[in-house]
C-alpha cells in the first residue's frame, strides 16, 4: 500500500513516467462533443445508477423496480435481474440486469448511503494495481471491487452467454461510479467490450490508471454536476487523476434536474480544473440530483447525518467537523490543486 503524504506529492508527480501536462495536452487535442444520443443516454443510465440503491439484494429473475419514480424507463423496458451482490466488509452493492428492449446487459453499482461520513473520513491511500505499469488505485475502491468482482464478473459472463448480441454497460453513481470504472476496466481486459457511465464519481487512481482507462476501447462517459464536491476528491495534490473526458452539467446545481444538452460542457484532461474540479462549496444536493433524484428509491434517502460510531481516534476527531469546517477543508484542497497545477505548469514552461 502507498500512504501518500502532502510532502511526497511533488516527488510523486515528477517521478511519474507520464506527466500531467503531457497526458492532458494529448487529450485536449481530441474533438469531443455531446450528441443527442449521448445526452439521452446520460438521462437513461442514471436510472440504473439510482436503481442500484434498492435492487442490490434482489433475487435472480426479479424485475428491476424502484420506488419514488427512480427508474421508470428501466422498469417499462422490463429489465430483469441476472444476479445481485453486496459486500459485507465494504458495503458495496449492485446488480447485473438484462434489458430486452435496449438489448443491453447493465452492471450497476450503488454509492455510499452516508455521503457525509465518506467526505469527512476520506483517506488517500493507494494500492498498486495490475492493469498497467505504474498503476495506482484508491485502496478503498479497490477493496470494494475485489469484494464483489467474482460475483459481478460471473453474472456478466452468464448474461452474455444467454444474450451474445447484447451490449454491455457499466454504471455507477457516487462511490459506485468509482467501482463501475474499475469493473469496466477489468471486464474490458478480460475480453468484454463495454461502455462506462459514471455520475458524481470521485477520482479513482493515479495518472497511469486514468490514462489506461481513458484509452481503452469503448465509451467513457464521466458526468459531473455543477459544484458537486465528490468528483473533486481525492485531491490532485495526493496523486489522483480523473478519467477523461468530463461531461459537466454547468447549471446552478442544488436540486436542479431540468438540464438541456446546451448545459453540458465537455472538459478534457486528467487534471483539468476548468469544469467541476475548479468549483468550491459543499453542494450535496448537486451530488444527489443528476437529471433526477439519485436516491429516490433508497429507503430514507442518502444520509447527511454526522458519523457517531468511529472506532479510530483520527476518524472520531474528523467526525466532529461542522458543515462549515468540512466545506472549508474541501475548498482548501481545491485551492491547493489550483496552485499545484499552476506551479507545475510554470516549471514545465
From Swiss-Prot:
Compartments it resides in: Secreted
Glycosylation: residue positions: 346
Keyword Magnesium: no
UniProt GO BP: lipid catabolic process
Domain of life the protein comes from: Eukaryota
Thermal dependence: Optimum temperature is 35 to 38 degrees Celsius.
Signal sequence, renumbered to the chain: 1-15
One family name in Pfam for this protein: Lipase_3
Annotated active site: 174 (nucleophile), 228
Family membership noted in the UniProt record: Belongs to the AB hydrolase superfamily. Lipase family. Class 3 subfamily.
Protein name as it appears in the record: Secreted mono- and diacylglycerol lipase 1
Amino acid at each position: 500500500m502507498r500512504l501518500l503524504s502532502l510532502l511526497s506529492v511533488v516527488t510523486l508527480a515528477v517521478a511519474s513516467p507520464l506527466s500531467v501536462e503531457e497526458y492532458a495536452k494529448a487529450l485536449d487535442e481530441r474533438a469531443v462533443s455531446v450528441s443527442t444520443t449521448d445526452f439521452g443516454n446520460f438521462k437513461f443510465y442514471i436510472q440504473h445508477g439510482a436503481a442500484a440503491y434498492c435492487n442490490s439484494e434482489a433475487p435472480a429473475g426479479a424485475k428491476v423496480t424502484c420506488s419514488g419514480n427512480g427508474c421508470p424507463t428501466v422498469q417499462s423496458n422490463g429489465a430483469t435481474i441476472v444476479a445481485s451482490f453486496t459486500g459485507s466488509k465494504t458495503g458495496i452493492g449492485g446488480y447485473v440486469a438484462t434489458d430486452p428492449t435496449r438489448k443491453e446487459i447493465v452492471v450497476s453499482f450503488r454509492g455510499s448511503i452516508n455521503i457525509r461520513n465518506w467526505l469527512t473520513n476520506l483517506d488517500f491511500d493507494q494500492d498498486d494495481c495490475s492493469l498497467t505499469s505504474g498503476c495506482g488505485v484508491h485502496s478503498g475502491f479497490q477493496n470494494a471491487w475485489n469484494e464483489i468482482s467474482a460475483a459481478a464478473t460471473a453474472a456478466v459472463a452468464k448474461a452474455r452467454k444467454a444474450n451474445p448480441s447484447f451490449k454491455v454497460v457499466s454504471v455507477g453513481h457516487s462511490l459506485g461510479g468509482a467501482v463501475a470504472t474499475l469493473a469496466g476496466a477489468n471486464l474490458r481486459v478480460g475480453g468484454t467490450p463495454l461502455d462506462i457511465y459514471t455520475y458524481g464519481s470521485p477520482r479513482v487512481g493515479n495518472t497511469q490508471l486514468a490514462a489506461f482507462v481513458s484509452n481503452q476501447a469503448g465509451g467513457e462517459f464521466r458526468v459531473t454536476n455543477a459544484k458537486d464536491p465528490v468528483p473533486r476528491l481525492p485531491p490532485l495534490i495526493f496523486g489522483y487523476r480523473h478519467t477523461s473526458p468530463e461531461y459537466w452539467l454547468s447549471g446552478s446545481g442544488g436540486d436542479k434536474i431540468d438540464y438541456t444538452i446546451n448545459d453540458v460542457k465537455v472538459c478534457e484532461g486528467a487534471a483539468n480544473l476548468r469544469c467541476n474540479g475548479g468549483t468550491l462549496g459543499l453542494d450535496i444536493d448537486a451530488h444527489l440530483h443528476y437529471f433526477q433524484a439519485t436516491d429516490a428509491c433508497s429507503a430514507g434517502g442518502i444520509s447527511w447525518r454526522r458519523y457517531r460510531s468511529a472506532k479510530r481516534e483520527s476518524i472520531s476527531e474528523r467526525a466532529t467537523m461542522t458543515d462549515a469546517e468540512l466545506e472549508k477543508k474541501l475548498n482548501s484542497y481545491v485551492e491547493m490543486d489550483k496552485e499545484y497545477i499552476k506551479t507545475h505548469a510554470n516549471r514545465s514552461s
